[in-house]
Amino acid sequence: MKQGKFDIYVFADWKGMAAPKLMGILSAHYGKGKKAFGFEYDKDWIKTASQRLIDPDIQFFSGAQFPNNKENFGVFLDSMPDTWGRTLMKRKAAQHAREFGEKPQTLYDIDYLLGVFDKTRMGALRFKTSLDGSFLDDDHENATPPWSSIRELQAAAKNLEDDENIDVKKWLAILMAPGSSLGGARPKANIVDEKGDLWIAKFPSKNDTIDKGAWEFLAYQLALKSGIEMNECRIEKIAGKHHTFFTKRFDREGEDRIHFASAMTMTGNSEENLRFHTASYLDIAEF
């Protein structure tokens, strides 16, 4: 693991802002096999009317701040991929190593954070490694695919799940941009509809013993009948016996990004402490 400090410039770009604005700097500190993260607001951001509480561990004052009993801040973990997206990134790193006869690269939180395609990144935080550089990741080789490509996307996800040893370059080329930004463990991808709106397609998994897409759609219908507001959802049977579940991205309105933070972040929890503490909806109500 490299030693020293690595800075990432954090920008806010949510609905109502005329342009992205520097919020502060996320610093990764590496040393003696350990890593820690700190965040410091930009002095101009503290004065702006756009500020809001983005994480209970990041309060409205200047100077370096550090997460409470956690390695990293929850709000930045929310901007990273979860199991499926990380699987894609690891498979890509392994494929690159095989092609060039190298040792596979070990991926860290910074790699996951900056490896997400900026256009489809969840939420409204954006990241740079230099102020005059591009928002990362800026690899436009694989644009968000149209709805018409859903059969190919589902086939790619199935191939990656089915065999750890296949030549994955073709399938990764199809899935990296649309799939690496998303959380959760299930195979999924971003797609764009005929109006240009982003959706998430959640594919059947090889481990499914029931039609989870159909059950998720039923939960959506029950939520609507209960008065809960949700973005539009659909199901389609693309291939095989189970449905693919589609949900319109809740963090987008046209080209506008909408900021969000997970319940885990805003209640001050983490994956680690939830191993020893059972969270509930009461925690959300108290927040």
How does the language model describe each region?
Residues 1-287:
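Phosphate/dinucleotide-binding and metal-coordinating scaffold of catalytic cores
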